[in-house]
């Protein structure tokens, strides 16, 4: 069998996988490019409107005292009200910052998925390793049970051999025949029946003892088959996990993944109040709504300024050709410059009032969404801390139970080796020990997954 996952002492670290995902994950790249696109909007809204150039040509020159006007060129530049461009740039910058917080949220969720999948892969390999170790232990129990069964069949005391069985059966037949020959002779018949009964009891007891030992062998073989089937089922789970992990990194599914051979119980090195403060203030969703609310406040100010006039400054250049009078004398013909100023008149006040109201309502919505996000984070924080404390208690409990179950198993195994009794209890304690070991692995993985969840909520890297 070719294993898709490998264990190495100097394995590729989880942080290196996170770096690969940060560079290659398409969803994260899409979010980052959305942020870059939002940044490019800042210079767009902060620029002046394009200047306007107008050119007019008279097909029939206009007769004027200063000559014949042939053409006219007008250049005009409009200027928004004071501060409007600055507000536009601020609003675009704040929206870009909100986009960046969305990118950080996507990154944190991606990293959490990668860590969770990586921990699941570790748990899977540990479960397979534990099952293989327990199969080896059960095979040693099988050899012990076979040894007890063999010694029970060949021993002279408390056992039944084929020769003994034949002799006993012959005695029974002889006793039954003697009773029939003697007829009413009660003494001989009674003595024969007593010996026959004793022989039957001895044979049945010895046969049950041998049969019980054989049942022990069959029982342990059943347990081995069950564990072998469990291992095959666990091995079938390797490929889906490997595919999920590699696709999060945007790599081919054939790429191998290395996980640590030992995962220790995690802990929080930081003060919980400091972590809670980070969750409530540094979580990207909370900060995103902060920037959105600031952007809508700026939009409200922009709407107020857009209700003011726009000022235009320009120049008009008129081209003349000389005109002739009645005496055929040329007059005028000099081109003329004319400075110009224009002002827009924002008469539709309803439009600008509606723009201000829209920005105000959107700002209120962002505030409510931020409050809802903080409430949800508070719930998640309490549930996460509860799970973390419970995992710590469970780890301590399972470690103690594994120690006690191991001691009990050694005592029961010693008793069975010496006396041949209590094999069912040996298997029961062994199953308990396996259960405790599996629960310990699962709880350690859960604890590390919980810490990864806290890292996602607080937007920090603890380990």
Language-model features, listed with the residues they occupy:
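Bacterial Sec-pathway N-terminal export signals of envelope proteins
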Residues: 9-61, 74, 78-80, 84-87, ...
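Small/polar, glycine/serine/threonine/aspartate-rich low-complexity segments that form flexible
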Residues: 54-84, 88, 165-205, 260-269, ...
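Periplasmic alpha-helical coiled-coil/stalk elements that build and connect Gram-negative outer-membrane
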Residues: 109-278, 387, 391
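Short segments within alpha-helical structural elements
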Residues: 107, 139, 168-177, 183-184, ...
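Acidic, glycine-rich loop-and-beta core segments that form the ion-binding/anion-interacting portion
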Residues: 267-268, 272-322, 337
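Sec/SRP-type N-terminal targeting helices
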Residues: 29-33, 46, 80-110, 219, ...
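Charged, solvent-exposed faces of alpha-helical coiled-coils
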Residues: 27, 34, 41, 88, ...
């Amino acid at each position: 069998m070719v294993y898709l996952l490998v264990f190495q002492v100097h394995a590729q670290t989880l942080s290196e996988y996170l770096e690969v995902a940060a560079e290659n994950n398409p969803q994260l790249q899409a979010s980052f490019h959305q942020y870059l696109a939002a940044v490019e909007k800042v210079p767009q809204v902060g620029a002046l409107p394009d200047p306007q150039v107008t050119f007019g040509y008279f097909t029939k020159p206009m007769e004027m005292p200063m000559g014949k006007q042939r053409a006219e060129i007008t250049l005009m530049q409009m200027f928004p009200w004071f501060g409007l461009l600055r507000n536009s740039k601020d609003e675009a910058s704040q929206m870009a910052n909100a986009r960046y917080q969305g990118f950080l949220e996507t990154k944190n969720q991606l990293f959490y998925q990668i860590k969770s999948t990586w921990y699941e892969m570790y748990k899977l390999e540990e479960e397979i390793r534990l099952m293989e170790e327990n199969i080896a232990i059960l095979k040693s129990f099988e050899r012990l049970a076979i040894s007890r069964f063999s010694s029970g069949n060949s021993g002279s005391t408390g056992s039944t051999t084929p020769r003994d069985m034949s002799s006993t059966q012959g005695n029974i037949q002889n006793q039954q025949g003697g009773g029939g020959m003697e007829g009413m002779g009660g003494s001989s018949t009674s003595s024969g029946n007593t010996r026959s009964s004793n022989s039957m009891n001895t044979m049945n007891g010895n046969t049950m003892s041998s049969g019980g030992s054989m049942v022990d062998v069959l029982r342990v073989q059943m347990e081995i088959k069950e564990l072998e089937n469990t291992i095959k089922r666990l091995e079938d789970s390797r490929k889906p996990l490997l595919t999920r992990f590699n696709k999060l990194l945007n790599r081919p599914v054939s790429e191998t993944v290395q996980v640590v051979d030992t995962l220790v119980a995690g802990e929080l090195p930081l003060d919980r109040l400091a972590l809670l403060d980070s969750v409530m203030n540094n979580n990207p969703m909370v900060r995103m709504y902060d920037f959105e609310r600031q952007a809508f406040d700026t939009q409200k100010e922009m709407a107020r300024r857009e209700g003011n006039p726009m000022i235009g400054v320009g120049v008009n250049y008129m081209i003349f050709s000389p005109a002739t009078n009645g005496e055929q004398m040329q007059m005028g013909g000099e081109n003329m410059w004319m400075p110009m100023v224009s002002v827009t008149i924002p008469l539709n006040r309803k439009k600008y009032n509606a723009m201000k109201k829209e920005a105000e309502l959107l700002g209120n919505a962002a505030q409510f969404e931020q409050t809802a996000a903080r409430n949800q984070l508070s719930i998640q924080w309490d549930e996460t801390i509860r799970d973390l404390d419970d995992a710590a208690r469970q780890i301590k409990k399972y470690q103690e139970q594994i120690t006690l179950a191991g001691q009990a198993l050694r005592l029961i195994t010693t008793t069975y080796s010496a006396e041949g009794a209590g094999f069912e209890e040996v298997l029961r304690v062994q199953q308990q020990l396996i259960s405790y070991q599996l629960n310990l692995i699962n709880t350690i993985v859960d604890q590390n997954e919980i810490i990864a969840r806290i890292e996602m909520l607080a937007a920090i890297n603890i380990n």
